[in-house]
């Protein structure tokens, strides 16, 4: 999971 991949 990448928590910094939110758009």
Curated annotation (Swiss-Prot):
Catalytic activity, reaction form: choline + 2 O2 + H2O = glycine betaine + 2 H2O2 + H(+)
Record-listed E.C. numbers: 1.1.3.17
Gene Ontology molecular functions: choline:oxygen 1-oxidoreductase activity; nucleotide binding
Binding note for cofactor: Contains 1 FAD per subunit covalently linked to a His residue.
Alphabetically ordered keywords of this record: FAD, Flavoprotein, Nucleotide-binding, Oxidoreductase
Pathway: Amine and polyamine biosynthesis; betaine biosynthesis via choline pathway; betaine from choline: step 1/1
Modified residues (Tele-8alpha-FAD histidine): 5
pH dependence: Optimum pH is 8.0.
Function: Oxidizes choline to betaine, probably via two successive reactions with betaine aldehyde as an intermediate. Accepts either choline or the reaction intermediate betaine-aldehyde as substrate. Glycine-betaine accumulates to high levels in the cytoplasm of cells to prevent dehydration and plasmolysis in adverse hyperosmotic environments.
Protein name, entry field: Choline oxidase
Organism of provenance: Alcaligenes sp
């Amino acid at each position: 999971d990448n928590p910094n991949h939110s758009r």
